Amino acid sequence: TPQLFRIKQFDCALFDEASQILEPQALGLLCAKTEKGESAIGKFVFIGDHKQLPAVVLSPEAQTAVRDPQLNDIGLLDTADSLFERLHRLQMRSGDGRFVGLLNRQGRMHPDIADFVNRKFYGGELRPVPLPHQKETALPAPGADPLEQFAASTRLGFIDIVPDAPPQNNKANEAEADMVARLVQALIALYGRNGRKIEPAESVGIIVPFRSQIACVRSRLQQAGIRRAEQITVDTVECYQGSQRDFIIFSTTISRPYQLDVLSSVQRIGGADIDRKLNVAITRARRAFFMVGNRKILEGS
């Protein structure tokens, strides 16, 4: 606040989750002055990931796009972009990377999960810390049902769901919700079988694109009799950014090709197409990530 800067100067200020902070939101601190008219903050450090989801902006792209050549020259291409992204873009364009650093040690994802996003989105630069859960091997599942065996054998898996007919409500998918509940049951059984009880309310996260599917999944979890089902977080990928769970299940939900745009947020970054929604969804998982959806429709993306 202005009152604070009248009595104290700061050597440095950190902006965390900087890729979600728009320039007007940062302006007050960037321009802060002391009573003597000096800069109240000596320097700024921006920490964020422009390959994950940006700030939520309700205005359409046609209204946020910047077409002024002089503004484009300073990296201002879209007012929906964060200052972090603009400064990073300018640095990469200049070929001078002195002011850009990469925190490439990650302690969240098991390497089997991280491998995909590392290759597709991060140029192979990510490395595990490694923490104990990142060194775990697959759990044995002798005599288990096929779904439990699938959960035991993969850390990054896809389950194809093809309903007999498209759902009447195109924002809810009961067949996928059923599979999500079955998969949660399989994880509970698998870890219980190996003497490692899990609490789904703390360990399992479910990502869906629509509010209608949230209600559908919650209903199926409760019908399945899953312990503390009402406390399992079922939400959109935007709401999951910044959080993590041992197991993430992503119910894509869509049943019609025209809905594909809802699932992705593709941005051209560093010469590569980065799907920021998919990146966020996968990187929430510590031990396993499962995607549930209609393969034929999803392959159209």
Language-model features: where?
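Conserved helicase motor core of SF1/SF2 NTP-dependent helicases
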Residues: T1-S301
